[in-house]
């Protein structure tokens, strides 16, 4: 590590939206952002779980607009930068400008791991705005390390100054992570940073984040109490405790994060964010973690097991944005009975 300061990127107020169906109140956002800021995380990502303009029939309607959430968080911080997420095809460059005006200074432009070419316009515009511009390659387990590296190179060529390996399905192990970081870093410029976004569906969120750092990763996504889609993200307070024991420089207050996780975030969970039968199925089948709540709703409606829906989604290699197929899969399974 050579004393390198890790960049701690909190995603409680974006990925964590999935865990409560995008229903954070503005008071929740202010309280959580204030606690994270006092604990000295580097950035706080804020948006609907599916990014700017994700509030929709397909993904679920939010309790507030992205801009209301971003403004609430921006007003609460003095140290951390406010980040947001943009998926080309859901959010536009106009939405990005509005998010910037509301206080966002970092944007993660997210595409499926084979579709980096759709990010060009959004990355270039973010750079024009002067934003810290990140390329975010979702479902990275569905690409070979070599294929992922080429997609990373594309995002870098458009102007992204940091590229993320994103384990949206929580499906990778430590060797999968190591292989992707080695291959991606080998093709990027020396000054292009890398980041890890882990999910905890196989209980490997923290271990995978540690493996990434050992391969030279600069930025680590994590969330309080693991608040996120599926079994959640790498739990922030757990990663920080582990990093501390490894002697790594993270710059955050562990005990403040522990308090925020248990006092502010865990009480908001209407479904426990944990590894259980359904969330384990996500990781095992390599399914997009935010399919969890949608699949559980379909299972309840049609009287079938959520696990069966999730496994079938994995067999069909469904990816983020295909939430509408969950009901189709449920009906197909019902017809097979």
From Swiss-Prot:
Active site, renumbered: 18 (proton acceptor)
Binding site for Mn(2+): 15, 197, 199
Keywords: Aromatic hydrocarbons catabolism, Lyase, Manganese, Metal-binding
Pfam families given in the database record: DmpG_comm, HMGL-like
Taxonomic superkingdom: Bacteria
Ranges where the Pyruvate carboxyltransferase domain occurs: 6-258
Catalytic reactions on record: (S)-4-hydroxy-2-oxopentanoate = acetaldehyde + pyruvate
GO terms under biological process: catabolic process; L-leucine biosynthetic process
CDD domains named in the record: DRE_TIM_HOA
PROSITE patterns, sorted: PYR_CT (PS50991)
Keyword Metal-binding applies: yes
UniProt entry tagged with the keyword Lyase: yes
The enzyme's E.C. designation: 4.1.3.39
Molecular function per GO: 2-isopropylmalate synthase activity; 4-hydroxy-2-oxovalerate aldolase activity; manganese ion binding
Annotated site residue numbers, Transition state stabilizer: 14
Binding site for substrate: 14-15, 168, 197, 288
Annotated family: Belongs to the 4-hydroxy-2-oxovalerate aldolase family.
UniProt xrefs under NCBIfam families: 4OH_2_O_val_ald (TIGR03217), PRK08195.1 (NF006049)
Identification of the protein by name: 4-hydroxy-2-oxovalerate aldolase 1
Upper classification of the organism: Bacteria, Pseudomonadati, Pseudomonadota, Gammaproteobacteria, Pseudomonadales
